[in-house]
């Protein structure tokens, strides 16, 4: 099992190119199941979760290829299997997105109950109830969610009980081929939903309101091919901005969009960072200063993103002052804090709240990554700590950050990947 060895006390500065958003690329890849003609996708990151998704699509009968430029070419015209099997699905909860397009286009589909990050309850019941309201018959049997419908799904008004990005995407995909009109109320508003809707509309869907809490989908009989470029990854962008903020550095994030990160940029400025934005870049300069502590409360978009909570927890652990972090989206999402405490951080956890007391310096040690965003916070902690830090279970990072050690080295980090069996 691979690990990272990180040598600390680096000031991270330079320019970094931001990859395509994993959280947009995954639903878009599954949405390609709906198309009767070939689709070309660009700016698709090279990640473990993307590899798993492409394997699932191949299993279904989609012809998948990456050309010399890195573009992903998909032809779903001859899908002949309708099951996403356990051996592929077990590592990635996003695989539930295969179900909606299969049922919408082929009137049947089954997906093994998914895995992924172990950060609290992420039930698929909202996906299931949405498909049922569109007319699908669904049973949970032998570890699989099995769905079928005798004819086309039928549009209706669906109020999502709790704001859910995943369920919003599932219902939106399914409704594109349903008879009549579907209205999604209390829809999630994330930029990745807007990007998926843009992709579906390029294929001939009729979706309006994506990015608001009220999405309307006029069903069509078929979707055709298109070309689409995946939006930049706002969470990767925020992560590299944090890298500069905690190390007193200056980082320019290229090929990104500031308008998807308003809540994060506001908090970075509150922490004392100088942040400048252009149409396609964000520059953060700490001018060599230590950040100030900032209170964080996660919320659905356009609120503060839960996927940036771990990175800001690290910032607060090395900031001047005391801060309160409240996690409202997921249970069990403070697993990075005990590891940061082992590095000399000071914090107390009570329920969904953490109180962080800033310290001047962290110390390198061996730590264990528990989920995707927790793991990157530990790597960044290693970059600024004294001595050497070993980060174990970095397969979590490979699920969501493209070429992370190369990008960090480009900013001045001293980091290397090694196999656990190579350790002396």
Curated annotation (Swiss-Prot):
The active site is at residue 117. GO terms for molecular function: UDP-N-acetylglucosamine 1-carboxyvinyltransferase activity. GO terms for biological process: cell division; cell wall organization; peptidoglycan biosynthetic process; regulation of cell shape; UDP-N-acetylgalactosamine biosynthetic process. It comes from the Bacteria. GO terms for cellular component: cytoplasm. The keyword ATP-binding does not apply. Its EC number is 2.5.1.7. Transmembrane segments: none annotated. UDP-N-acetyl-alpha-D-glucosamine binds at residues 93, 122-126, 164-166, 307, 329. The modification 2-(S-cysteinyl)pyruvic acid O-phosphothioketal is found at residue 117. Cell wall formation. Adds enolpyruvyl to UDP-N-acetylglucosamine. Belongs to the EPSP synthase family. MurA subfamily. This is UDP-N-acetylglucosamine 1-carboxyvinyltransferase. It comes from Haemophilus influenzae (strain ATCC 51907 / DSM 11121 / KW20 / Rd). The lineage of its organism: Bacteria, Pseudomonadati, Pseudomonadota, Gammaproteobacteria, Pasteurellales.
């Amino acid at each position: 099992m691979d690990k990272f060895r990180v040598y600390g006390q680096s000031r991270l500065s330079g320019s970094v190119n931001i990859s395509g958003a994993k959280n947009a690329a995954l639903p878009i890849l599954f949405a390609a199941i709906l198309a009767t003609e070939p689709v070309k996708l660009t700016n698709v990151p090279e990640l473990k979760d993307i590899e798993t998704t492409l394997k699932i699509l191949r299993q279904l009968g989609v012809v998948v290829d990456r050309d010399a430029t890195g573009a992903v070419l998909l032809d779903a015209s001859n899908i002949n299997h309708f099951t996403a099997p356990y051996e592929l699905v077990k590592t990635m909860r996003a695989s539930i997105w295969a179900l909606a397009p299969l049922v919408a286009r082929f009137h049947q589909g089954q997906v093994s109950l998914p895995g992924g990050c172990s950060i609290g309850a992420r039930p698929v019941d909202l996906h299931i109830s949405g498909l049922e309201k569109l007319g699908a018959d669904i049973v949970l049997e032998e570890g699989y969610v099995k769905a079928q419908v005798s004819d086309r799904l039928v549009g209706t008004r669906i109020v999502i009980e709790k704001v859910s990005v995943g369920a919003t995407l599932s219902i939106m995909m399914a409704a594109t081929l349903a008879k009549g009109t579907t209205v999604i109320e209390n829809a999630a508003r994330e930029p990745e939903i807007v990007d998926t809707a843009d992709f579906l509309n390029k294929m001939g869907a009729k979706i309006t309101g994506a990015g608001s809490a009220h999405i309307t989908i006029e069903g069509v009989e078929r979707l055709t091919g298109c070309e689409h470029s995946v939006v930049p990854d706002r969470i990767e962008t925020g992560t590299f901005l944090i890298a500069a903020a905690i190390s007193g550095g200056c980082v320019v994030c290229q090929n990104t969009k500031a308008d998807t990160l308003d809540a994060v940029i506001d908090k970075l400025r509150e922490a004392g960072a100088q942040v400048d934005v252009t149409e396609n870049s964000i520059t953060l300069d700490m001018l060599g200063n230590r950040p100030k502590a900032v209170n964080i409360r996660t919320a659905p978009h356009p609120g503060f993103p839960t996927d940036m909570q771990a990175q800001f927890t690290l910032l607060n652990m090395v900031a001047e002052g005391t801060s309160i972090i409240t996690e409202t989206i997921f249970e069990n999402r403070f697993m990075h804090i005990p590891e940061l405490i082992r590095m000399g951080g000071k914090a107390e956890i009570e329920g969904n709240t953490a109180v962080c007391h800033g310290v001047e310096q962290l110390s390198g040690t061996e730590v264990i990554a528990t989920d995707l965003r927790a793991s990157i916070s530990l790597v960044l902690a290693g970059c600024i700590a004294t001595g050497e830090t070993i980060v174990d279970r970095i397969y979590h990072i490979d699920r969501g950050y493209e070429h992370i050690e190369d990008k960090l080295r480009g900013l001045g980090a001293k980091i290397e990947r090694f196999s656990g069996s190579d350790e002396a």
